Amino acid sequence: TLSWQKDLGDKKMRNEFGEGSTPALHGNHLVVVWDHQGESFVVTLDKRTGKELWRQKRDEIDSWATPLILEEDGRLQVVTGGMKKLRSYDLETGETVWECAGTTMNPIPSPVAGDGLVFLTSGFRGNSLKAIRLTGAKGDLTSSANIVWTLDRDTPYVPSPLLYDGILYLLKSNNGLLSAFDAKTGAPHYQVQRLERAPNVFASPVGAAGRVYVAGRDGTTVVLKHGTSFEVLAQNTLDDGFDASPALVDREIFLRGYRYLYSIAEP
């Protein structure tokens, strides 16, 4: 039975790339970012009824990044990427909490957060990473001390970064070239290390049990040791290709290939 539906209008994307931003859900709040070639906005709906709770116009063009909902100082915030500005909205009211200068064209990677920081990246026609301290973040942060560190090279175009136990992992563009940084300081542990059997990557890396998994478009998943040194533990190839990010549930890894859905676990 259909409970409700909501027409948000026609979305006009450049180059016929289509849509890519996933709605974000927290409690009864369903957040949708609608950045396109027309009038862009972010809207929050009641998940039970589809009723519009708030809407904010956005001076943005196309983006594909999924918003991130997080809590800071008891306040729930919606963090969004963007070419012109990075923004955070109050989840309850839609008020802009903070903003700062944006990233590059075509922002696709989704924000990740941890240890009091949120990380926003992009990598089309340029490179951009901003590590933003959430404590005390308010108003325009562009030239403030809340921008803890930045990076202007070797950032991802499609894959989102992985923040795992204090280490931020980044792929370069859509290539199997991996870097790892101290998340708090930006100090590099290693940079642009080649994943030889996964040269092309759209999927975001994932981490669990002291390992990092990178699924390549050519069918190979590279397994690396989580840590400050680059060490490949295994390279597992299936007769398929992967663009979707792996999903980790308990002790299983789910891979959605071009042809099949795989569940991988110890027997």
Regions found by a protein language model. Name each.
Residues 1-267:
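Noncatalytic, solvent-exposed loop/strand surfaces
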